[in-house]
């Protein structure tokens, strides 16, 4: 019989339910978590034995959204879900980042977490629910895991923090921050903000961590009742004698190698030291394992770097703790792009471009929470040559998607509103060199490229990556970390923003015991670094260009009456298609009568505007127009009088005498003056050639309505 065990608790304005023992009983652990009708089913499977020779922790986190959760059938050709979307990949990373550091060092058994969204309330985002589910399932499983963790979303509305705001509330919020941590410490922060102060951001982190304690308590209660026995796993015994022998051979040499400031030269020397040490030790004792020796060497390497930093000595590349690497900033580096920049910080370099398009170029995202249109696209590419390696080149990997989203968050707060700048904007960051913080280099490069493209961003933005080395109560916060300092340190702390405040904050902490005070020091040190970088960037370009690139489409806007929209579109889109082909422009019409004409050639745009004004012009009774015969019938002739309008000249209105045969007087394509006699309720136009000929006044083109044009 199925005997589900359920725990229910209040979490801010939401009710959360944890249920286990009902489904997936062959998995190591499974939990159904629901928050106000948004439900995520999370399973964990762990292998009891590690694969022979396994030298890393193979944790996989999969997050998948099922369209049935929202009562929909997939819109794809096969009518089923396919590869993970960008959003699913980002949430999988959001789950992975806080749980990964909580597995004990040396644990290399394969573990897989699968979170499946099975029901969704459009007001409750499933990401927090999935994070709570992963924490609960891992805690129940008995797998060595130093959790549970809690997770919370924090908004900032009317100068107040809001716990787990609804989707509607998020639209009003100046902050969207996700924080995860254990009972004692914060482990992960991911956020975007509308240029908020350091104190406000830190307050949000602390608020979220305090509020999520109720989640941790509920999971602990569930584990007491339904948790599986803890695995009898012990780390391999430390071989002190072997450690000492390896240290004697390699420590001083590695210490010298880490004084080489050039990354590639340093890596080559470290590799030589490691391979020579391993060869010598195996020659002395063939029973030794090369993987084990490699791990000991890595630990020595880590200790060399960390102890030097804690002792106040210069860093790997000779800098002090708060120094920024040398900067080189250039704009307009690519002649035919709409905007471009090359941003170099030490051995990290990004070639960034900005491309302008029309509303038609915006990306339509069919997401579980509903369809939305994204008019600001940010793509980050990390080719293998950027770190001097060979490798696969193709579709973006999880890391590239995550870094691209972080960089986008950094720039989003300063992007202009669509009503002021009606362009779709795509930024692409090509990482051409990398040695730490390429995502923050992408933020700096994007700000420069957007200004070079003439995009009226509200302020310049820059990003910086901070690091931390901590032993006991002794700690050092590092500015502008290298790749090695990220890898060997205890924290990766990325901050982007303008002179006025923070636009994005991402934090990943590998150890417990990071206090509010340490985070405060890191944020303040990051602010100084950010302002320094902005100062250098402003020397290259200190404001958006006054005009967009000559190669970018210019969008001209006019307004027409809503009842004229059908005339411009035509039957089945025939008129607007013909206009687009005739004028060589792109034309978009909105429901309120706003017409946007995009063209790289100003004359083509003016011609398109003139043609639209002709089509939408009102026909004036009693006025004479030039016309062209389009169709001849027994009872008269149909003529076009400009702007796609057609009227009938009855046989009795062709001449001032009796007409027996229309073709005796008119031929197809013939141009004749006509006078408007009447426009009936159906919009049909009755015309006269006879009366137009009798009158002496010259013919006129249709009068165009007054229009508003904005470039």
From Swiss-Prot:
Region of interest called Disordered, as start-end residue ranges on this chain: 689-711
Entries under Pfam families matching the protein: KH_1, PNPase, RNase_PH, RNase_PH_C, S1
Cellular compartments annotated: Cytoplasm
Domain of life (superkingdom): Bacteria
GO molecular function terms attached to this record: 3'-5'-RNA exonuclease activity; magnesium ion binding; polyribonucleotide nucleotidyltransferase activity; RNA binding
Keyword Ribosomal protein: no
Keywords, alphabetical: Cytoplasm, Magnesium, Metal-binding, Nucleotidyltransferase, RNA-binding, Transferase
S1 motif domain residues: 622-690
Disulfide bridge positions per record: none
Keyword Transferase on entry: yes
Chain intervals with Low complexity compositional bias: 694-711
Required co-factors: Mg(2+)
Domain KH: 553-612
Annotated Mg(2+) binding sites: 486, 492
GO cellular component: cytosol
Group of enzyme by EC: transferase
Enzyme Commission number(s) from the entry: 2.7.7.8
Reaction it catalyzes: RNA(n+1) + phosphate = RNA(n) + a ribonucleoside 5'-diphosphate
UniProt-listed GO biological process terms: mRNA catabolic process; RNA processing
Subunit record text: Component of the RNA degradosome, which is a multiprotein complex involved in RNA processing and mRNA degradation.
NCBIfam families: polynuc_phos, PRK11824.1
PANTHER family: POLYRIBONUCLEOTIDE NUCLEOTIDYLTRANSFERASE, POLYRIBONUCLEOTIDE NUCLEOTIDYLTRANSFERASE 1, MITOCHONDRIAL
Function field: Involved in mRNA degradation. Catalyzes the phosphorolysis of single-stranded polyribonucleotides processively in the 3'- to 5'-direction.
Family: Belongs to the polyribonucleotide nucleotidyltransferase family.
Protein name, UniProt field: Polyribonucleotide nucleotidyltransferase
Annotated organism of origin: Salmonella typhi
Gene encoding the protein: pnp
